Amino acid sequence: MDGNMKALIKKPGEPGASFELVPIPKIDKHEVLIKVKAASICGTDVHIYNWDEWAKSRVKPPYVFGHEFSGEVVQVGENVTTVKEGEYVSAETHIVCGKCLPCLTGKEHVCKKTLILGVDTDGCFAEYVKMPAANIWKNPAGMPEDLASIQEPLGNAVHTVLTGMTAGVKVAVVGCGPIGLMAVAVAKASGAAQVIAIDKNEYRLDLALQMGATDIISVEKEDPLKNVSALTNGEGADLVCEMSGHPTAIRQSLKMAANGGRVHVLSLPEHPVCIDMTNDIVFKGLTVQGITGRKMFETWRQVSGLLQSGTIQIKPVITHRFPMEEFEKGFELMRKGQCGKVVLIP
């Protein structure tokens, strides 16, 4: 498809972004072109927008960023047989090689050569985005476009919570950003006996209650370690989901976990974190697991099942919608933490 499109461009050397006209992407024989209907802002996008140390070390602007979206397929490559024009889709945003040992043994989510849409390649904050056909996930016709756009981050929450979780356990979610809020909903829907949401942001703690938290702890007012202990009869949480990336919160996550419990870390600290491995992991017999992306496509199937069955109610997490040209409003809300999920409409 020839012509230009409007897109959100990350420029080098400074915070912010610009809304510009750029060429519509050209697809190869294995790719599809999608007209974007909705694109949501992720914490990773905020790192890029802010141009922090992580962004400076990882991305190579100028380029189109953004990676969470839904849309309609408008063009398919000549070798594509699994996707058709007109289909309503979202996409797995980790583009893998398919040839390394993890890929060949069913662990594509930890492919050694992963490229991430909108981080390592041009992304979806635009009118059009291209994707390998192998990454496409087909959406049911009745799914709202904004909800379809947040299936990818919901997959992060599902992967974080459901890896090793069993019904009836006590779960603590540390950090109630959008994915943390989704993790609260997933834990509650999946049979957790108790879901404790921990954050310093009162706005997001209120959202956590809407998403199903049984208890909330404001770290500005309360000691999270003492309160988790009190709420769990001194046992600690069976599963702690660390979503904040703050060094203190990471150390506290290990301490608040029950002996023999699990700590799942999805967050991305900007710098190395010092922990007491001997006392907080080894002697407690903890299982600590890093969570990256989504299992392909087991996690997507779980997300689809939870949404279509009505088991999980995720819409309250979408708090704001803006035309894409008003992106600055959305990013400012994300930077201040005065929102759940923000969706941009091209």
Swiss-Prot record:
Keywords: Cytoplasm, Metal-binding, NAD, Oxidoreductase, Zinc
SMART domains, alphabetized: PKS_ER
GO annotation, biological process: L-threonine catabolic process to glycine
Cofactor annotation comment: Binds 2 Zn(2+) ions per subunit.
GO terms assigned for molecular function: L-threonine 3-dehydrogenase activity; zinc ion binding
Catalytic reaction annotation: L-threonine + NAD(+) = (2S)-2-amino-3-oxobutanoate + NADH + H(+)
Pathway where it operates: Amino-acid degradation; L-threonine degradation via oxydo-reductase pathway; glycine from L-threonine: step 1/2
Residues involved in Zn(2+) 2 binding: 97, 100, 103, 111
Matching InterPro entries: ADH-like_C, ADH-like_N, ADH_Zn_CS, GroES-like_sf, L-Threonine_3-DHase, NAD(P)-bd_dom_sf, PKS_ER, Zn_alcohol_dh
Subcellular localization, as worded in the UniProt entry: Cytoplasm
Entry-linked PROSITE patterns: ADH_ZINC
Domain of life of the source: Bacteria
Entry's EC annotation: 1.1.1.103
Site positions for Important for catalytic activity for the proton relay mechanism but does not participate directly in the coordination of zinc atom: 152
Main location: cytoplasm
Active site residues of this protein: 44, 47
One Pfam short name: ADH_zinc_N
Cofactor: Zn(2+)
Residues at which Zn(2+) 1 binds: 42, 67-68
Gene Ontology CC entries for this record: cytoplasm
Enzyme category, top tier: oxidoreductase
Role played: Catalyzes the NAD(+)-dependent oxidation of L-threonine to 2-amino-3-ketobutyrate.
Similarity-based family: Belongs to the zinc-containing alcohol dehydrogenase family.
Matches recorded under NCBIfam families: PRK05396.1 (NF003808), tdh (TIGR00692)
Name of the protein: L-threonine 3-dehydrogenase
Organism: Bacillus licheniformis (strain ATCC 14580 / DSM 13 / JCM 2505 / CCUG 7422 / NBRC 12200 / NCIMB 9375 / NCTC 10341 / NRRL NRS-1264 / Gibson 46)
